[in-house]
């Protein structure tokens, strides 16, 4: 008999059956691992200025990137239930290193520099855009990069171009719409639909998509559960 499986939040793969007396059939989960990702226990690990510096911890990396001021730090703070886990700034382009946050050696949350910010020197912009490229193409533990898209504004060409670049280079992708509370619902919905329509010209299959608000916490639990599910499945491959 295969052992029971408990996965807090969701139980998966209820396919195993066994026969007992009187020909009764009991359905058991397929495996035993208890998967709980306690995001509130996330801790800052280290900042890196090059991929060569990154210490391989063997934990799956869930990276976050987007245009400057898209709400990336606020999202990471909401995800970890901490006000200052990732440093927020009113000054766009503040994040210029790769910041790692470790969640009990189960998950690495990776805060990547924002792209598309013009008000820094050309040399500095090239340096941290090169850092982004190097990480996305070379990280052996990258599970997915979430591209954050501002739902309060119409589709931005730079977001679509970045997603297309990731698609060409087979970078595993997800999309997180942020700031869904900033405009009236109809306008927000129209912006997201327009973005997805524009994206469909480049992707036959749309990347996994989430809608969030760091202010109201809308969609945060859904994102946490999705990450938890991926970690659970990684343990049972």
Where are these regions (language model features)?
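Conserved G1/Walker A P-loop phosphate-binding module
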Residues: 28-117
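Canonical P-loop GTPase G-domain recognition
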Residues: 39-48, 183-237
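Conserved nucleotide-sensing/catalytic segment adjacent to the nucleotide-binding pocket
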Residues: 105-140
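Conserved C-terminal guanine-recognition region of P-loop GTPase G domains, centered on the G4
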Residues: 134-206
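Conserved nucleotide-binding/hydrolysis micro-motifs of P-loop NTPases
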Residues: 94, 107, 114-117, 152-154, ...
